[in-house]
Amino acid sequence: MTPSIIDTHTHPFDAAFDDDRTEVMARAAEAGIATMICPAIDSASHDSLFALCDSYPDMCRPAMGLHPTSVNDNPDWRNELDIVASYISNACNRRFYAIGEVGLDFYWSRNWQKEQTEAFEAQVCLSLEHNLPLIIHTRNAWPEMLDVLRTFKGGGVRGVMQAFS
């Protein structure tokens, strides 16, 4: 019997898979991947995310969020958060399975630490409001991540960590 595996974080909708996406998805299924949680990165990723989930409805589950590096040097990041909140509030009649990919990433720079932290906190609040788990991305920001999560201690925050250092 092949194991039934859930991949809690994957981006097969990325353009890097445009040439062999069908084969990638078939290999995943053959390997026992039953479900893939596919987190958004920013609004530029939404169309390809939704197309993938529509093409593989029995396997792919969308997650909605704003990746921390999509906040960097982006004057419209608050608008991006509004788009995330609108989708989560069911503006598109889709079910989302998590809030993600969210978090803090200071690997490249700390110049946007304040903005990333604000965006992450807002998305933690969204996850609590809608009772959805988080898909948390953390690079070179572990102490700061713990500081944010501690502010929600006892509040029911849940999810998975990925890309952490």
Q: What positions do the PLM features span?
A:
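Mid-domain alpha/beta scaffold segments of enzyme catalytic cores
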Residues: M1-S165
